[in-house]
UniProtKB/Swiss-Prot annotation:
Residues 383-397 have a biased composition (Low complexity). Belongs to the G-protein coupled receptor 1 family. This is Proteinase-activated receptor 2. The lineage of its organism: Eukaryota, Metazoa, Chordata, Craniata, Vertebrata. It is found in: Cell membrane.
């Protein structure tokens, strides 16, 4: 199985490169300085705007934060990873969504969940050029407050959307094994209802990201950051409670459901008698389990754990020593947009066929003609075999 292994290798390479970048950043700063997180401290100085001299609330950052904002970790490494995710994720998820919507006739629950997962990835990836440009230009945001809020909202919304839809997909696969004779139309209606509920939930839980002011001007660096620097009071108060609630409610609980579903699935597969066809299904189910667990370990677990640790250190100590690892983990979480199409490949046999036909530029009409031709050939072989056996029987008497 290549996709999980490739994901592990890519994740390991990214972590190695990130650790080197982080060490270089830390060595270039004063180790005795405090406030090792991107906390914006109020600096009540006046600055000249286009309409004259006005006094506004501006912010300053400590030496470590300045080194992170100007270092290669954020200005070189992050845009490289985001570029890879954009180049791979945009066409693969676009094709996946097209296959699910226009090529797949039977809308099973798994197809519905995977289509929503592809849509979530696509809605996140299309904003990546702005994020890439932001980091390349020294973490300087020039696109306005509204676009910054949209970018951050879609960034976190995609991560938690992916977690919830992967959980639904995992539970659904277990339910198919336990109850294979269920009514497909009823299941599809339930899946549509659950998908709509997930989108509504994500919209509601990401509202604070759209409301809170995400851009802050740093006069000392002459840059405007997008989400990288926030006021200290906001970080230790509302943002801590907000991200802690997200980590528990939208990551930890779904992760528990996913793990439970796969443990029960493995038990069911081991206890049931296996013929040749069932053995193939069992192997495909195991591939799905390994792929999903790899996604959780590489993409979701580090970012959510470090997110809680980062904000806890800010709240308890007024500083965070893990910010560099935290932003690398957030960067790794975007790899799910590249891995998800491989999950579709393992889960759905129809998706594999439709994707191959799409890549070979075969129209729906051409595929139907090929299927009819193949069916007629099989039927003719069976007929010739039957007539041959009948002739043999007659001559033996």
């Amino acid at each position: 199985m290549r996709s999980p292994s490739a994901a592990w290798l890519l994740g390991a390479a990214i972590l190695l490169a990130a650790s080197l970048s982080c060490s270089g950043t830390i060595q270039g700063t004063n180790r005795s300085s405090k406030g090792r997180s991107l906390i914006g401290k109020v600096d009540g100085t006046s600055h000249v705007t286009g309409k004259g001299v006005t006094v506004e609330t501006v912010f300053s950052v400590d030496e470590f934060s300045a080194s992170v904002l100007t270092g290669k970790l954020t200005t070189v490494f992050l845009p490289i990873v985001y570029t890879i995710v954009f180049v791979v994720g945009l066409p693969s998820n676009g094709m996946a969504l097209w296959v699910f919507l226009f090529r797949t006739k039977k809308k099973h629950p798994a197809v519905i969940y995977m289509a929503n997962l592809a849509l979530a990835d696509l809605l996140s990836v299309i904003w990546f050029p702005l994020k890439i440009a932001y980091h390349i230009h020294g973490n300087n945001w020039i696109y306005g407050e509204a676009l910054c809020n949209v970018l951050i909202g879609f960034f976190y919304g995609n991560m938690y959307c992916s977690i919830l839809f992967m959980t639904c997909l995992s539970v659904q696969r277990y339910w198919v094994i336990v109850n294979p004779m269920g009514h497909s139309r009823k299941k599809a209606n339930i899946a549509i209802g659950i998908s709509l509920a997930i989108w509504l939930l994500i919209l509601l839980v990401t509202i604070p990201l759209y409301v809170v002011k995400q851009t802050i001007f740093i006069p000392a660096l002459n840059i405007t950051t997008c989400h990288d620097v926030l006021p200290e009071q906001l970080l230790v108060g509302d943002m801590f409670n907000y991200f802690l609630s997200l980590a528990i409610g939208v990551f930890l609980f779904p992760a528990f459901l996913t793990a439970s579903a796969y443990v029960l699935m493995i038990r069911m597969l081991r206890s049931s008698a296996m013929d040749e066809n069932s053995e193939k299904k069992r192997k495909r189910a195991i591939k799905l389990i390994v792929t999903v667990l790899a996604m959780y370990l590489i993409c979701f677990t580090p970012s959510n754990l470090l997110l809680v640790v980062h904000y806890f250190l800010i709240k308890s100590q007024g500083q965070s020593h893990v910010y560099a690892l935290y932003i690398v983990a957030l960067c790794l979480s975007t790899l799910n947009s590249c891995i998800d199409p491989f999950v579709y490949y393992f889960v759905s046999h129809d998706f594999r066929d439709h994707a191959k036909n799409a890549l070979l530029c075969r129209s729906v009409r051409t595929v139907k003609q090929m299927q009819v031709s193949l069916t007629s050939k099989k039927h003719s072989r069976k007929s010739s075999s039957y007539s041959s056996s009948s002739t043999t029987v007659k001559t033996s008497y």
